């Protein structure tokens, strides 16, 4: 696992928004100009197990803060881009739908449709007071047809503000040295009257089929590339923020120690 930090800002004279970004990566670089406010993001990612050509879980985490504000700017869009050779095998999986999640919640989805889980800590400001709120994330297969893969993310928070959101993301192929990735917009999350919109302080996410799911449902899920390029697996994630700033994260996941670099 590797960890790195990045900063990004936006021009005061023009609030143009470059929206794209999220969690599966390590290390960062930034795309920005002289800034009015700066967002700081620290991200980590790893494969588990770390074995070439094998089904694995992808585990990622992120910490958010601002250099000029007590609360980081709310996230407006998230994109995750994996390395070339990363593949998905959803044979044996089931699917869920946005309508079911909105009506019944995760309990309405088939067990075979589960594709990951996570959570984190939300944060907002009210009358000078910083308020934190835990949230959970559950990920489901929305479409398991090859070439048309989709995932659904269900975010749930209970107190002090009740929030239930469903995000829809289409999985697409990015140019080399990258591979599969997905992106989704994040709407404004209102909190309490006179309070700021909800931001994220930290988040963690695990994607893929667990060993139990692989055994009982025969779903491989995410498969690590068969070859690791010299220097490791290149990954990228970009976070678009409500204040117009963008943090672009480019990094590598180290090759398995026992693998031969290509």
Where are these regions (language model features)?
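Bacterial N-terminal signal peptides
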Residues: 16-29
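N-terminal secretory signal peptides that target proteins for export/translocation
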Residues: 1-14
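Ser/Thr/Pro/Gly-rich, low-complexity intrinsically disordered stalk/linker tracts of secreted
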Residues: 24-27, 35-262
């Amino acid at each position: 696992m590797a960890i790195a930090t990045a900063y990004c800002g936006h021009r005061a004279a023009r609030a143009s928004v470059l929206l794209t970004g999220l969690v599966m990566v390590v290390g960062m670089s930034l795309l920005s100009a002289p800034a009015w406010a700066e967002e700081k993001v620290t991200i980590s990612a790893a494969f588990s197990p770390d074995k070439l050509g094998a089904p694995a879980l992808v585990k990622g985490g992120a910490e958010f803060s601002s250099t000029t504000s007590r609360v980081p700017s709310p996230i407006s869009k998230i994109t995750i881009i994996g390395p070339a050779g990363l593949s998905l095998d959803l044979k044996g999986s089931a699917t869920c739908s946005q309508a079911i999640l909105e009506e019944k919640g995760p309990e309405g989805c088939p067990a075979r449709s589960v594709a990951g889980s996570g959570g984190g800590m939300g944060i907002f400001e009210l009358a000078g007071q910083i308020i934190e709120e835990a949230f959970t994330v559950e990920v489901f297969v929305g479409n398991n047809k090859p070439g048309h893969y989709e995932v659904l993310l269900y975010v749930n928070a209970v107190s002090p503000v009740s929030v239930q959101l469903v995000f829809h993301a289409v999985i697409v192929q990015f140019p080399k040295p990258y591979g599969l990735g997905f992106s989704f917009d994040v709407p404004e999350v209102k909190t309490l009257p006179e309070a700021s919109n909800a931001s994220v302080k930290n988040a963690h996410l695990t994607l893929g089929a667990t060993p139990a799911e692989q055994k009982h449902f025969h779903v491989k899920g995410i498969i690590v590339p068969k070859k690791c390029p010299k220097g490791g697996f290149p990954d990228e994630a970009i976070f678009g923020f409500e204040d117009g700033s963008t943090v672009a994260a480019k990094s590598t996941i180290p090759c398995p120690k026992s693998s031969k670099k290509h």
